[in-house]
């Protein structure tokens, strides 16, 4: 049976390649932010979503250097499928404190764009937050836009319902959330997140702590939110996608020494989750990755997965495709062979694949790059970006 399925998958890819090899390539690339330019010294943590009107919203963190200190949440908009971009917009600047980890979701029923993010005191560092010796905890916040991302509400502290007070570290995404399209939980908004927890057998930052993932979800268009049960052990930054039958899959950065993505399933809209397993088809070097339900392509439901597809370092940004609800990943398209790290995927209004990721010539964090390609290009030979 597995052999038959594999043969069918190969035939489908061959057919797809034949269908598109003569098609004119509609490709463009934009550097949205670059290290050492503008108001900030560094830019990291990409997130991109498509509004109900088809506008692209690209978020990132503007920062001095590392993950602590004065970090602002930034945004650029595109109303022409990524060909041109607006000037930089500051969504949240809280003096010298840290405002980051963007994770937006678009409510397709109301048009409202919800944006989860996390905040902590700028002089607190991750180790202190995990060990609970920081001056203040790291907290989830939420804001929204009703005008296609042009303006945003004041961020609201969501600690009471979205965070367990026994947790140390906390982070939303980074990446995007989803709205469930099928089954009894249709319309539910789901945001992936992660945290650290007390674990006597753990060794996170040389302390008795572990990493866990979870989701936040809302059944009333974002008025109220709940948190799911945790997914653990060794689970950190994550993204969620929906399968054809409404099952949710969490695709997770793993600290379990497997060099592969951790996977967990939910049959109840994200409230509870299965024990983790590791998908050896999706190799990783303990780095964030992104997954997207692209919808139907050539009559088949297609999922995409994007990450640095290596077991060490952060290089070889690669997108893989699945036509069987993430059971198998039958194609790998190299986007950029050089240093590269965090990423986010989007389906553009014109049907192309949008990829927003960190990359550079010497280090992965030199540029924040947006690339848009026709989906058929995923099945052609060659590298999308030979150079930056």
Predicted regions and their residues:
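Bacterial Sec-dependent N-terminal signal peptides
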Residues: 1-26
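Asp-box/BNR beta-propeller blade signature and adjacent active/binding-site loops
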Residues: 22-388
């Amino acid at each position: 049976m597995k052999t038959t399925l594999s043969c069918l998958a190969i035939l489908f890819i061959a057919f797809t390649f034949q269908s598109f090899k003569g098609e004119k390539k509609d490709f463009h690339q934009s550097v949205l932010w670059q290290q050492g330019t503008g108001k900030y010294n560094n830019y990291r943590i990409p997130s991109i979503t498509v509004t109900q009107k088809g506008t692209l919203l690209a978020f990132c963190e503007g920062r001095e250097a590392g993950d602590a200190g004065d970090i602002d949440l930034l945004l650029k908009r595109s109303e022409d499928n990524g060909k041109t971009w607006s000037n930089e917009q500051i969504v949240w600047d809280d003096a010298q404190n840290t405002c980051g980890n963007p994770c937006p979701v678009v409510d397709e029923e109301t048009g409202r764009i919800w944006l989860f993010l996390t905040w902590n005191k700028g002089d607190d560092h991750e180790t202190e937050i995990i060990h609970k010796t920081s001056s203040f905890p790291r907290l989830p916040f939420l804001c929204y836009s009703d005008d296609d991302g042009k303006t945003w509400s004041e961020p609201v502290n969501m600690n009471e319902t979205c965070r367990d007070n026994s947790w140390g570290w906390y982070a939303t995404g980074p990446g995007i959330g989803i709205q469930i399209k099928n089954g009894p939980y249709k319309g539910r908004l789901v945001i992936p997140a992660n945290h650290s927890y007390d674990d006597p057998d753990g060794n996170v930052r040389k302390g008795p702590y572990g990493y866990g993932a979870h989701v936040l979800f809302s059944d009333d268009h974002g008025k109220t939110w709940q948190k799911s049960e945790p997914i653990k052990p060794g689970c950190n930054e994550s993204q969620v996608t929906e399968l054809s039958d409404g099952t949710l899959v969490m695709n997770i950065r793993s600290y379990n020494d497997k060099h592969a993505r951790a996977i967990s399933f939910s049959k109840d809209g994200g409230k509870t989750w299965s024990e983790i397993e590791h998908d050896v088809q999706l190799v990783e070097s303990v780095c964030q990755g992104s997954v997207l339900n692209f919808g139907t392509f050539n009559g088949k439901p297609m999922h995409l997965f994007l990450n640095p597809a290596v077991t060490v370092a952060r290089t070889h940004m690669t997108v893989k495709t699945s036509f069987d609800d993430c059971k198998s990943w039958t194609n790998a398209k190299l986007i950029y062979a050089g240093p590269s790290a965090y990423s986010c995927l989007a389906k553009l209004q014109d049907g192309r694949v949008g990829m927003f990721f960190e990359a550079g010539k010497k280090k992965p964090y030199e540029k924040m790059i947006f690339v848009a390609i026709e989906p058929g290009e995923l099945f052609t030979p060659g590298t999308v970006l030979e150079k930056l």
